[in-house]
């Protein structure tokens, strides 16, 4: 009786015995110029084709906590997305691709008996980044208010959204992306919003929930 031997089994076995690391290489990943091209970590990628060194890093997104970049724990709720731009001598350089607030932070901002204000703003920075920004803020109890609830009526919410939108656009269009990001985590833009909106209704806990890059800089 003859036994048919599957020739594919031996080839599969040989493939399994190959060292996985032999098909990968370790590269260093650097933050964009916004953070002075600081080293943010290392990662394994597939070995590149010598004819096209950029093929293995095209469109790859790296998410990094701002706390790790700056070495300050108070910024652990902010995550940055960096997109791979080019690779040279096992060093990957990136560009800004967005910002998100952690889920835990967003949940901590939502309180009962208060009004949560959400604002969406579209604008273009001085150096050509077209951004979609999502901001949230919480109503704040006025000093002389005795009521337990701190609700904002519809007309006040519309006025607050207009005021916040105007502030963000005026700030954003006159800055490049580096200055605008620095303005965010220095909290100066939040302080400006709180002061200007207090004339309509007091707010606090102002935070940018998310930034999407709709169009990258062409400069």
UniProtKB/Swiss-Prot annotation:
Primary location class: cytoplasm
SMART domains, sorted: Ribosomal_S3Ae
Molecular function terms from GO: structural constituent of ribosome
Keyword annotations from UniProtKB, A to Z: Cytoplasm, Ribonucleoprotein, Ribosomal protein
Single GO cellular component term: cytosolic small ribosomal subunit
A single BP term in Gene Ontology: translation
Record localization: Cytoplasm
Signal peptide (residue range): none
HAMAP family per record: Ribosomal_eS1_euk
Subunit text: Component of the small ribosomal subunit. Mature ribosomes consist of a small (40S) and a large (60S) subunit. The 40S subunit contains about 33 different proteins and 1 molecule of RNA (18S). The 60S subunit contains about 49 different proteins and 3 molecules of RNA (25S, 5.8S and 5S).
Family in the record: Belongs to the eukaryotic ribosomal protein eS1 family.
Protein name, per record: Small ribosomal subunit protein eS1
Organism name: Guillardia theta
Organism lineage string: Eukaryota, Cryptophyceae, Pyrenomonadales, Geminigeraceae, Guillardia
């Amino acid at each position: 009786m003859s036994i048919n031997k599957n020739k594919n089994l031996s080839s599969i076995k040989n493939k399994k015995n190959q060292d996985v690391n032999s098909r990968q290489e370790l590269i260093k990943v650097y933050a964009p110029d916004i953070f002075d091209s600081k080293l943010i970590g290392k990662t394994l990628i597939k070995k590149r084709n010598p004819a096209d060194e950029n093929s293995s890093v095209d469109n790859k997104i790296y998410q990094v906590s701002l706390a790790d970049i700056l070495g300050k724990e108070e910024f652990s709720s902010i995550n940055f997305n960096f997109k791979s731009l080019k690779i040279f001598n096992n060093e990957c350089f990136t560009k800004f691709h967005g910002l998100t607030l952690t889920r835990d932070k967003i949940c901590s901002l939502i309180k009962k008996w208060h009004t949560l204000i959400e604002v969406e703003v579209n604008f273009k920075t001085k150096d050509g980044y077209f951004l979609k920004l999502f901001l949230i803020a919480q109503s704040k109890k006025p000093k002389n208010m005795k009521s337990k609830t701190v609700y904002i009526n519809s007309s006040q919410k519309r006025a607050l959204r207009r005021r916040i939108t105007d502030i963000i656009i005026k700030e954003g269009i006159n800055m490049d992306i580096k200055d605008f990001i620095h303005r965010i985590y220095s909290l100066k833009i939040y302080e400006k919003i709180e002061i200007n909106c207090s004339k309509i209704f007091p707010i606090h806990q102002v935070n940018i929930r998310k930034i999407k890059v709709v169009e990258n800089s062409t400069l």
